[in-house]
Design a protein with these regions (language model features):
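Short, small-residue-biased leader/transition segments that mark boundaries at the very start
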Residues: 1-3
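Short acidic-hydrophobic, aromatic-tinged amphipathic segments that line or gate anion-handling sites
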Residues: 6-10
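Non-catalytic C-terminal accessory region of glycerolipid acyltransferases
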Residues: 12-139
Length: 139
C-alpha cells in the first residue's frame, strides 16, 4: 500500500491549493481544534466560548466536499482511527450563519472524540479566553 501526503503551509496560496486537491479527489486533513489562521468563528467548546477556524466549514460549503470528524488514538499495539458520520452541509440561512452552525457541529464532534481519550489531546497554546487570563496571573 502506498500513501502519498503533502503538507500545504498556511499562506496566500493555501486556499487555492486545498481547493485544487479537493477537485482532484484528494483527502484533506485540517486542524480544526484551534484557530491558527485568523479566520475564526465563535463557538462553545467544552462549555466555554472560544474561536475555532472557519476553514473546514467554508471549504465544505463552497466545494461540496464531505466533512468527516476523525480522530487517531494511540493504542498499545499501534494506532486506532475513528471516523464519525459526515456533518450535514444543508444550507439553512446566509453563508456566514451556515459556517457558524457547521463549525459549532464540528466543535461538538471534537468534544465527543476528545472525551474518548482526553489524555491524547494536546494544546500548545491557550485556546479559551480563560486560558489567557490564567496565564497573565502566573509569575
Amino acid at each position: 500500500m502506498c500513501i502519498r501526503d503533502r503538507v500545504i503551509p498556511v499562506g496566500p496560496d493555501a486556499g487555492s491549493q486545498v481547493i485544487k486537491a479537493i477537485s482532484d479527489k484528494r483527502v484533506i486533513v485540517l486542524v480544526s481544534d484551534r484557530d491558527i489562521g485568523g479566520s475564526s468563528v465563535e463557538v462553545e467548546f467544552f462549555g466555554e466560548k472560544t474561536l475555532l477556524p472557519a476553514g473546514p466549514a467554508t471549504l465544505a460549503l463552497r466545494t461540496g466536499a464531505t466533512l468527516l470528524p476523525v480522530a487517531i488514538y494511540n493504542k498499545g499495539d499501534g494506532c486506532h482511527g475513528v471516523v464519525r458520520p459526515a456533518i450535514s452541509l444543508e444550507r439553512k440561512g446566509k453563508f456566514r450563519s451556515d459556517v457558524k452552525r457547521i463549525t459549532q457541529t464540528i466543535a461538538e464532534e471534537m468534544e465527543f472524540l476528545i472525551r474518548k481519550a482526553p489524555e491524547q489531546w494536546h494544546l500548545m497554546q491557550p485556546n479559551w479566553p480563560s486560558d489567557s487570563k490564567s496565564e497573565k496571573g502566573r509569575v
